[in-house]
From Swiss-Prot:
InterPro entries: ZP-C, ZP-C_dom, ZP-N, ZP_chr, ZP_dom, ZP_dom_CS. GO terms for cellular component: collagen-containing extracellular matrix; egg coat; extracellular space; plasma membrane. It is a single-pass type I membrane protein. Residues 352-424 form a propeptide. The lineage of its organism: Eukaryota, Metazoa, Chordata, Craniata, Vertebrata. It comes from the Eukaryota. The modification Pyrrolidone carboxylic acid is found at residue 23. This is Zona pellucida sperm-binding protein 3. Residues 1-22 form the signal peptide. The gene is Zp3. Residues 409-424 are cytoplasmic. GO terms for molecular function: carbohydrate binding; receptor ligand activity; structural constituent of egg coat. SMART domains: ZP (SM00241).
Length: 424
């Protein structure tokens, strides 16, 4: 009976039985709720030279098993190699396979790919009962120390090999926290937030160098995917942050913390015609001698909306004049803008000098959780508040009615007692 009263009160106050469940829920990619305490449906094992991904066919925790053929790894669509049993699917892939991307940070080598569940209609039907899901996967290996089973024997590098060793530079592009002090712990964003990006080069024993972001492009899938469309330029024309020309306030940070580091912010966005909730940013990074004066080919320029002009991080202001009309040079980025992302690798390899002072680096995926002030959420909140107010009002009326009845019964009892005592 108590549970019935609780259910009645819950329905009265909350407006529906689905809100009466006290168990906390969280959302898997694709919007399917799963209890917090449940085991993870995707498990990753990072080995010395390969990764093993084990996927439960009950991917959404609903008891409905997904089809193994609907599961692939990476943009190459690597198929599962081993099926453990009827309820589990396993992928075995080398670290460099399945379109895996490698990124070098200060302390680690990061190999990243993604698990894709792309359901297809079965039995000639045109309906789907599960969602499309993209699960980011990362394997991190410490740069300091030995990850192999055999110890490395240190050796002296001959002098004639030292020059070539010193020419190797390590470029990186990382998502940072708002204070720029630490790397962002999770690549998740709401629309309306700002992404803090830090490009960096580790020079080692090289002569002092200054880093520049030549051009950056954003795509819903990793480059060089030939199907990367649509795309959006963030930086173009040898260092012009063109994304700041739109309604955003994207800009380079002034001053830069170190010559070998360049920081910039980008107002988060997503592609209107893309069903994916992910974003990849690929930047072409390059270096120049630290004592070289910035010019049209080596610059970092942001658009200032107040003055309606381009301003450099360092150097004379006139080096940014070409950003307004895009004729800084006949650069590979200009050709890239004409042909699109599918020509990225071909154009870069054809126009780039055959040296190690520039590189293409990708950060991602950036995962969108929806708008920070989503109208649907606001509408649900308003509806819930209305239901609660209505419920409280009805509960108050019921309480007052019950109190009136109790008071009336009490008075009647007192009156009856008085009448019975009169004959005495």
């Amino acid at each position: 009976m108590a549970s019935s009263y609780f259910l009645f009160l819950c329905l009265l106050l909350c407006g529906g039985p689905e809100l009466c469940n006290s168990q906390t829920l969280w959302l898997l990619p694709g919007g399917t709720p799963t209890p917090v305490g449940s085991s993870s449906p995707v498990k990753v094992e990072c080995l010395e030279a390969e990764l093993v991904v084990t996927v439960s066919r009950d991917l959404f925790g609903t008891g409905k098993l997904v089809q193994p053929g609907d599961l692939t790894l990476g943009s190459e669509g690597c198929q599962p190699r081993v099926s453990v049993d009827t309820d589990v699917v396993r992928f075995n892939a080398q670290l460099h396979e399945c379109s895996s991307r490698v990124q070098m940070t200060k302390d680690a080598l990061v190999y990243s790919t993604f698990l894709l569940h792309d359901p297809r209609p079965v039995s000639g039907l045109s309906i789907l009962r599960t969602n499309r899901v993209e699960v980011p996967i990362e394997c991190r290996y410490p740069r300091q120390g030995n990850v192999s089973s055999h110890p490395i024997q240190p050796t002296w590098v001959p002098f004639r090999a030292t020059v070539s060793s010193e020419e190797k530079l390590a470029f990186s592009l990382r998502l940072m926290e708002e204070n720029w002090n630490t790397e962002k712990s999770a690549p998740t964003f709401h629309l309306g937030e700002v992404a803090h990006l830090q490009a960096e080069v580790q020079t080692g024993s090289h002569l002092p160098l200054q880093l520049f972001v030549d051009h950056c492009v954003a795509t819903p899938s990793p480059l060089p995917d030939p199907n990367s469309s649509p795309y959006h330029f963030i930086v173009d024309f040898h260092g012009c942050l063109v994304d700041g020309l739109s309604e955003s306030f994207s800009a380079f940070q002034v001053p830069r913390p170190r010559p070998e580091t360049l920081q910039f912010t980008v107002d988060v966005f997503h592609f209107a015609n893309s069903s994916r909730n992910t974003l990849y940013i690929t930047c072409h990074l390059k270096v120049a001698p630290a004592n070289q004066i910035p010019d049209k080919l080596n610059k970092a320029c942001s658009f200032n909306k107040t003055s309606q002009s381009w301003l450099p991080v360092e150097g004379d202001a006139d080096i940014c004049d070409c950003c307004s009309h895009g004729n800084c040079s006949n650069s590979s980025s200009s050709q890239f803008q004409i042909h699109g992302p599918r020509q990225w690798s071909k154009l870069v390899s054809r126009n780039r000098r055959h040296v190690t002072d520039e590189a293409d680096v990708t950060v991602g995926p950036l995962i969108f959780l929806g708008k920070a002030n989503d109208q649907t959420v606001e509408g649900w909140t308003a509806s819930a508040q209305t239901s609660v107010a209505l419920g409280l009002g009805l509960a108050t009326v019921a309480f007052l009615t019950l109190a009136a009845i109790v008071l009336a019964v009490t008075r009647k009892c007192h009156s009856s007692s008085y009448l019975v005592s009169l004959p005495q």
